[in-house]
From Swiss-Prot:
Keywords: Cell membrane, Disulfide bond, Glycoprotein, Immunoglobulin domain, Membrane, Phosphoprotein, Signal, Transmembrane, Transmembrane helix
Primary gene name: NFAM1
Domain Ig-like V-type, first and last residues per copy: 50-150
Region annotation Disordered: where it falls in the sequence: 190-219, 234-262
One GO term of the biological process aspect: signal transduction
Molecular function GO terms recorded: transmembrane signaling receptor activity
Places the protein is found: Cell membrane
Descriptive protein name: NFAT activation molecule 1
Domain notes: The ITAM domain displays no close similarity to any existing ITAMs, except for four conserved positions. The phosphorylated ITAM domain binds ZAP70 and SYK.
Claim: Transmembrane is one of the keywords in the record: yes
Length: 270
């Protein structure tokens, strides 16, 4: 029996133009055939929600996927599972979910929303999580949802000693400024001295002419002191005129008279 050469035939439904070889059309049919079968089945798995999520360790987190398939006897029965790929590209084993096929209309497209809830142990569980649907003759998975897992939440960085020193130095400067201002005000008030009460009434000249004498004081000293006080009071009354209030020099004269009277009093007493 002689070996006959292999003959290539074009796929049915693809007319071959005259003059072209059959090999290119055969290659095109091989490339288009798997996609045509996949589209004809109508199964798809789509991840809904955010493509990137973040979660703390030992905290529940959920991602969702939507399964679309034709409700026919061939695709009524299927199982839904999930798996993940870590940052190094290692794939974990598939784990079952609580999603089960639902009721639909015969020979119509049916959609099933599936939610997967996980409690991830730590940062090592960071990766892309996929929904995978297995039918008796095919398996389809989704595009995946990336989940970033953190062992702990946000923590404020510890305060550096430089920051504490800056706060302390600023507080010290504030205290010193307040104390310095208080000292300046107190010193200014002390330099002015307590003023005499302008409403103080002058003593009666008759009472000044007959004062009560202390046994240890001389008559001359007692009389001279009372007269000086009377003169100073008269000078103060003369300096309180309207013209004296208007002139700063006239306002300083009563104080000068008082100072001169005090000096004279001290000299005479000595």
């Amino acid at each position: 029996m002689e070996n006959q050469p292999v003959r290539w035939r074009a796929l049915p439904g693809l007319p071959r133009p005259p003059g072209l070889p059959a090999a290119p059309w055969l290659l095109l049919g091989v490339l288009l055939l798997p996609g045509t079968l996949r589209l004809a089945g109508g199964q798809s798995v789509t991840h809904t929600g955010l493509p990137i999520m973040a979660s703390l360790a030992n905290t529940a987190i959920s991602f969702s996927c939507r399964i679309t398939y034709p409700y026919t006897p061939q695709f009524k029965v299927f199982t839904v599972s999930y798996f993940h790929e870590d940052l190094q590209g290692q794939r974990s084993p598939k784990k079952p979910t609580n999603c089960h096929p639902g009721l639909g209309t015969e020979n119509q497209s049916h959609t099933l929303d599936c939610q997967v809830t996980l409690v991830l142990p730590g940062a090592s569980a960071t990766g892309t999580y996929y929904c995978s649907v297995h039918w008796p003759h095919s398996t389809v998975r989704g595009s995946g949802t990336f989940i970033l897992v953190r062992d702990a939440g946000y923590r404020e960085p510890p305060q550096s000693p430089q920051k504490l020193l800056l706060f302390g130095f600023t507080g010290l400067l504030s205290v010193l400024s307040v104390v310095g201002t208080a000292l300046l005000l107190w010193n200014k008030k002390r330099m002015r001295g307590p003023g005499k009460d302008p409403t103080r009434k002058c003593p009666d000249p008759r009472s000044a002419s007959s004062p009560k004498q202390h046994p240890s004081e001389s008559v001359y000293t007692a009389l001279q002191r009372r007269e000086t006080e009377v003169y100073a009071c008269i000078e103060n009354e003369d300096g309180s005129s309207p013209t004296a209030k208007q002139s700063p020099l006239s306002q300083e004269r009563p104080h000068r008279f008082e100072d001169d009277g005090e000096l004279n009093l001290v000299y005479e007493n000595l």
